[in-house]
């Protein structure tokens, strides 16, 4: 599991290539085949629409570029699940769109994502399923049928207008909310 959030998990003082390959557990191959890994990074970057030089220092990267390098590192290390934590709090709208493009690219290749956000507009058209949480508990899980905001509006209407706590869902402790098989 990899977490991408405002606090970067990349190592300052190292290059993009060092962070993606050396620190993702393929250091022997990186030392032996530096040139081929630079080509591999360029292929990944082209697939998701970014251009970050392999030899660039991590501390020189923008927040968006750091997110993209962390995503590339997750892919290269074989991570099956990426948790994105309140990305819209620190990325601009155009960068979020570019990140969503990369998420779709990796999701189509088998990587799973949990996207935590307070902005339901941000989730429209990206998520297959939305979970509404209250005080740390999942109270409702909704499949996204139309892929638009009407799915989320319908889900949220169930919980608006009440001054008391939202109702507990039928999900009990121990029931499966997410299956990664």
For the regions a protein language model found, what residue spans apply to each?
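Q-loop/switch helix immediately C-terminal to the Walker
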Residues: 7, 12-26
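Short coil-to-helix "N-cap" segments within the ABC nucleotide-binding domain's helical subdomain
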Residues: 26-46, 63, 93-94, 144-149
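C-terminal boundary and immediately downstream tail of ABC-type ATPase nucleotide-binding domains
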Residues: 43-49, 149-177
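Hydrophobic anchor residue at the start of the ABC signature
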Residues: 67, 71
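Helical segment within the ABC ATPase nucleotide-binding domain
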Residues: 96-109
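H-loop/switch region of ABC-family ATPase nucleotide-binding domains
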Residues: 117-118
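Conserved catalytic segment of ABC-fold P-loop ATPases
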Residues: 125-132
């Amino acid at each position: 599991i990899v977490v991408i959030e405002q606090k970067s998990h990349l190592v300052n003082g190292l290059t993009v290539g060092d962070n993606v390959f050396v620190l993702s557990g393929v250091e022997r191959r990186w030392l032996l085949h530096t040139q081929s890994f630079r080509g591999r990074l360029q292929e990944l970057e082209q697939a998701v629409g970014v251009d970050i030089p392999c030899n660039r220092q991590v501390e020189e990267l923008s927040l968006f570029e750091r997110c993209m390098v962390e995503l590339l590192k997750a892919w290269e290390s074989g991570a099956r699940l990426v948790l994105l934590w309140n990305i819209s709090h620190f990325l601009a709208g155009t960068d979020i769109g570019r990140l969503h493009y990369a998420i779709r690219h990796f999701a189509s290749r088998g990587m799973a994502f949990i996207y935590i956000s307070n902005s339901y507009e941000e989730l429209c058209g990206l998520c297959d399923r939305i979970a509404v949480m209250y005080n740390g508990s999942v109270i409702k899980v909704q499949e996204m049928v139309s892929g638009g905001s009407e799915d989320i509006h319908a889900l949220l209407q169930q919980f608006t207008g009440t001054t008391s706590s939202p109702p507990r869902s039928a999900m009990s402790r121990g029931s499966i909310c997410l299956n990664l098989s």
